[in-house]
């Protein structure tokens, strides 16, 4: 029986690997322009670090059999935050870091049992900057990354934003014993569940109306102001969205604010966001991030420096998205150097070396061909190579 990869694992072909590398290099060039330094967090961490003090569920972590509790990272933020607060604690703030690498998440397979998902991410983390200034830099950087990726109009990119402070505001009139149930219903857009919770009739009606409160930031903030009055948080969000309007419009990114939006991992204690694009089948999340001050404090950051925010881009979905569009750059075809029976391998190797000096990719056929047509057929079979035929 042929060996199969583990459930959830994937074998990438050479073209996919090269595309992933090219995308990561594009993003890295943007991060460097903005003054971010590259780090390489370990794939294996202690479970208490990976679970971020309970913010990440234990079932999401791939555990390793070892003498101490270890696991594979489900994301890179916790590992980078730990490094920022320990080995890099003496470096001045703001501390700007970026990393690229594989993350592993565990989930239940459809047929039962464990399924391990392996994905490539590339992202940035900014430490030591309080709200809302860090978010203004990070989202501006995200727009610069979007420009470098060159999404197309058919992708309809949209930046969905939420804030834990907005959720706290929605829950403030709810009796404490009911807040967890109401919060779950709001996050899951569960209208029926919200209607069954024993709330005062006017409060239930308000929450049901706020369940549909999502749209342009100005419209949403105006509606929230009518319900909760003036709030400093509203001013911060207005400032952030005003700054984003120009860069987002230039890249065709639509801004959307949703007070009930909360991410899967409960790392975040401030702004949360994700960038969503359309595909032929369904929308896909290509970037996500937010503020995680509590995580930085748990890692031992000093008072006054206990701030952290960042985002990551999902390379594999972006690769698939761009491969379906015309945005991929045109590159010169790969060459195949082949020689006739009247020539020699030495001559072919010399020709290959010449092409490499010109910066062209060239492979070589190590055995002679009796005719040019056979060499052309081999070049086609090998993937549409351009033939360089040597026949003195």
Curated annotation (Swiss-Prot):
Its main location: cytoplasm. One of its GO terms (biological process) is histidyl-tRNA aminoacylation. Pfam families: tRNA-synt_His. One of its GO terms (molecular function) is histidine-tRNA ligase activity. Keywords: Amino-acid biosynthesis, Cytoplasm, Histidine biosynthesis. Pathway: Amino-acid biosynthesis; L-histidine biosynthesis; L-histidine from 5-phospho-alpha-D-ribose 1-diphosphate: step 1/9. The keyword Transmembrane helix does not apply. GO terms for cellular component: cytoplasm. The keyword Membrane does not apply. It is found in: Cytoplasm. Belongs to the class-II aminoacyl-tRNA synthetase family. HisZ subfamily. This function is generally fulfilled by the C-terminal part of HisG, which is missing in some bacteria such as this one. Heteromultimer composed of HisG and HisZ subunits. HAMAP family: HisZ (MF_00125). This is ATP phosphoribosyltransferase regulatory subunit. It comes from Parasynechococcus marenigrum (strain WH8102). The gene is hisZ.
